[in-house]
Amino acid sequence: MTTSVSLLGASGSVGESTLRVLRAYPQEFRLHSFSVHSNLEKAREIQKEFSPEFLCVSDSTADRTVLGNKIGKTQVLYGESALCELVREPEVQIVITAIVGSVGLRPTIAAITSGKRLGIANKETLVTFGPLVNSLIAKHKTKVVPVDSEHNALFQLLESLNRDSVEKIVLTASGGSFRDLSVEQLAYVTKEQALHHPTWNMGPKITVDSNGMINKGLEVIEAHFLFGVPYERIGVVIHPQSIAHGIVELKDGASFVYASYPDMIFPIAHSLFHPEPVPKSLRSYSAKDWGKLEFWEPDLKRYPGLGLAFEAGKAGGTAPCIFNAANEAAVELFLKDEIRFTEIPDYIWYTLDEMPIDFPTSLEEYEEVDRIARKTVLNLKARKVVSAC
């Protein structure tokens, strides 16, 4: 009997890797439904190959005459609200949320409250709304398996260890494309340079985040909410080879390391099959192929956004929500060539400084904080606060 999967964000890098896994295991899984934001050509290709029950184009301004309302047996839905309809479908058993940004929140909550198993790759949902999402996960006893390579690695390690023996969890980071540049050189990084990553093929926003290690900061906050580990016991190391994806340090001084070829098919396959083991290798890669492995601590002068993430996480309340929203707004300005790469963390810092930290209890309150933080970034830009410093 095949397991029905709903894939949100099918046209992105995680979505494409998920489709690779589904192709490798046609007897085990079938694509029940999927979404794209606005890539209609990609949507047509996926529909033709997998013939799912539903297809959602989340961009409400998309030209509806291109795909219409039905292709073969596939119903075509439009708008962000339709994402929730997909995951609530009774036949859906597993939901993979690979949508970038806080837009992934409502479909993630819909999956949690509908009793679906959740493979979460949308880190912004936990970063922005962590306490609220965790309370819903506990209430509905939802099984959540992280899809990000680092969190999936830590998930597998922690599942196999006695939690009382754990001293610290460590996320690895490639260091991005600019790890060898001086701090002075970073000020002149171009958009074209920032959209290149040495290891992973990702979308523009995540690539920019990764090159400034703000992405790793988001992952630190996500790890806190996923695993319940205090920030003082979460570490980050730069590991350029991207072979080791997660490290668990034990109280006795020993460490366990999860290592694999840097390919998203490994964590995705694990999240789909869990708690059963993945039945066959998708890509052979042994220790003799690793070569030299290097690890070192990140320089927070080079990566100030990482330090800000730890500060926001420790502050708690709405601070992570403000951090994420300010970053998304600042990255958007950078991609429009309106601010420098090195100004992104400055906008985050000033937004955190200008906004009070609250402790909301409702989704609407969190969303209002998110909205105000984005508006604050634009106000800072208009007032030339950052560039004046």
From Swiss-Prot:
Pathway: Isoprenoid biosynthesis; isopentenyl diphosphate biosynthesis via DXP pathway; isopentenyl diphosphate from 1-deoxy-D-xylulose 5-phosphate: step 1/6. SUPFAM superfamilies: 1-deoxy-D-xylulose-5-phosphate reductoisomerase, C-terminal domain, Glyceraldehyde-3-phosphate dehydrogenase-like, C-terminal domain, NAD(P)-binding Rossmann-fold domains. Mn(2+) binds at D148, E150, E219. Gene3D superfamilies: 1.10.1740.10, NAD(P)-binding Rossmann-like Domain. It catalyses: 2-C-methyl-D-erythritol 4-phosphate + NADP(+) = 1-deoxy-D-xylulose 5-phosphate + NADPH + H(+). NADPH binds at S11, G12, S13, V14, N39, N122, E124, G203. It is an enzyme of class 1 (oxidoreductase). It comes from the Bacteria. Keywords: Isoprene biosynthesis, Manganese, Metal-binding, NADP, Oxidoreductase. GO terms for biological process: isopentenyl diphosphate biosynthetic process, methylerythritol 4-phosphate pathway involved in terpenoid biosynthetic process. InterPro entries: DXP_reductoisomerase, DXP_reductoisomerase_C, DXP_reductoisomerase_N, DXPR_C, DXPR_C_sf, NAD(P)-bd_dom_sf. Signal peptide: none annotated. Pfam families: DXP_redisom_C, DXP_reductoisom, DXPR_C. Its cofactor is Mg(2+); Mn(2+). One of its GO terms (molecular function) is NADPH binding. 1-deoxy-D-xylulose 5-phosphate binds at K123, S149, E150, S174, H197, S210, N215, K216, E219. Its EC number is 1.1.1.267. Belongs to the DXR family. NCBIfam families: Dxr (TIGR00243). Catalyzes the NADPH-dependent rearrangement and reduction of 1-deoxy-D-xylulose-5-phosphate (DXP) to 2-C-methyl-D-erythritol 4-phosphate (MEP). HAMAP family: DXP_reductoisom. This is 1-deoxy-D-xylulose 5-phosphate reductoisomerase. It comes from Leptospira borgpetersenii serovar Hardjo-bovis (strain JB197). The lineage of its organism: Bacteria, Pseudomonadati, Spirochaetota, Spirochaetia, Leptospirales.
